[in-house]
């Protein structure tokens, strides 16, 4: 992790020597506000402003498993003033799940850095009777297809992780796709869904 941060710091130092940015930089998040990718972008924005100067603005362009925002960035001028802050979904998963995406993930983007690496974790509301992974598996086996699992959308990494979990544990649940991670957390904390 230290090497990654040093590489980012070195890249930012070199970038500032090139008099960039010379206009506001739009950091497009292809998901709704409140999810993890949005929070990462909003955490990076003031740090980038302090390090390189200029104005950085987060613009959420959600929809279609993140492909709307990614497509907007792919169509933007290649001048370094429009950046995509995303998870792997729109660039790795969506091209394989959707019939067509409005970009070529390998050709239409210059990949700059991995800002964060975060595992998918299984969470339940604090009031849930399930206090361990073993509890969740036992419930799934005792009452197949009853537990609801909220994801940030069809084809998202958390959706695919849930499907893999059910496959590997020989269980099943009810997938409840949301339009982003923010709404998932709201309903999870409110008890509208059993897990995420």
Each model region followed by its residue ranges:
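N-terminal signal peptide c-region/cleavage motif recognized by signal peptidases
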Residues: 14-16
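Residue-level signal for nonpolar/aromatic packing positions in well-ordered secondary structure
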Residues: 25, 34, 41, 58, ...
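Paired acidic/hydrophobic, glycine-rich loop segments that form the ligand-binding mouth/hinge
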Residues: 80-86, 148, 194-196
